């Protein structure tokens, strides 16, 4: 049923999304944005081998990362003194998996306000097979389109993993949003981390006129490939690693984001 709700966006990167909630202009507080693969679910839909099995892979059969549903519930609940905190997801899975992925969320009792999928069929139609496994341009584009619709009082907490380049994508987005990285230098940095030139240029063009907003308050990276944190060494201070959902929850409490 969720496939019928998908909105198609072509720029700055092909994506399809579902948005259930629009925040009022005077809303203030944390907004949690989660990667799906390897951060919420123990899966890798973005692998080419996995994509070839679609639609036979069902998200309902995938295990959530231990403790993550409870963490998502806590984030949604927040301090419990008003509206529930906004919760959005970004997935490199194709939009054909909207139903199964959201069914998994329902099974886990996870309330969400929106989810963005990579428009894999559109990327393939453009003859960009090599871009199926490159996620930085897609994730930054999804964050751009989400953030431009959020009120000025929103503060983003971005959750990803070190299996790919989530830390790089999120920290680049933080610089972009704050206005310290725009234009040619943004395009160059995107290409440097693997984005196709056409998408790097499209992102730089899209970001150019946007207001400067220091909107990213935290980048939270699940340490999958290197539990020692080696893959996020040297990243900006807002980037923090977590091995377990309990670790992440404790860090959010320490930062005053959660009770």
Regions found by a protein language model. Give the residues of each.
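Non-catalytic pre-domain segments flanking phosphatase-related domains
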Residues: 1-34
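Short acidic/His/Gly/Ser-rich catalytic and metal-binding motifs that mark active-site loops
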Residues: 40-51, 124-126
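Basic, amphipathic juxtamembrane/active-site segments
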Residues: 46-68, 177-182, 186
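Surface-exposed cleft-lining segments at the edges of enzyme active sites
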Residues: 55-59, 87-89, 127-132
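C-terminal cap/substrate-recognition subdomain and adjoining C-terminal extension
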Residues: 93-259
């Amino acid at each position: 049923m969720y496939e019928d709700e998908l909105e198609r966006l072509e720029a700055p990167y092909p994506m399809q999304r579902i948005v259930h909630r629009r925040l009022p202009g005077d809303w203030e507080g944390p907004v949690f944005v989660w990667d799906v693969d390897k951060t919420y679910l123990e899966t890798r839909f973005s692998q080419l081998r996995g994509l070839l099995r679609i639609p036979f892979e069902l998200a309902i059969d995938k295990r959530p990362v231990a403790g993550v549903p409870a963490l998502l519930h806590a984030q949604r609940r927040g301090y419990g003194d008003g509206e529930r905190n906004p919760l959005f997801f970004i997935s490199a899975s194709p939009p054909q998996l909207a139903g199964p992925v959201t069914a998994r969320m329902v099974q886990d009792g996870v309330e969400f306000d929106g989810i963005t999928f990579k428009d894999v069929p559109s990327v393939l139609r453009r003859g960009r097979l090599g871009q199926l496994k490159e996620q930085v341009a897609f994730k930054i584009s999804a964050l751009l389109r989400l953030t431009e619709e959020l009120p000025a009082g929103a503060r983003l907490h971005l959750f990803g993993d070190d299996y790919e380049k989530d830390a790089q994508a999120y920290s680049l987005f933080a610089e972009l949003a704050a206005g310290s990285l725009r234009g040619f230098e943004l395009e160059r940095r995107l290409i440097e981390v693997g984005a196709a030139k056409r998408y790097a240029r499209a992102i730089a063009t899209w970001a150019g006129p946007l207001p400067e907003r220091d909107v990213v308050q935290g980048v939270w990276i699940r340490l999958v490939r290197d539990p020692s944190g080696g893959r996020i060494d040297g990243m900006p201070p807002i980037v923090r690693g977590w091995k377990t959902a309990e670790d992440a929850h404790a860090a959010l409490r320490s930062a005053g984001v959660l009770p």
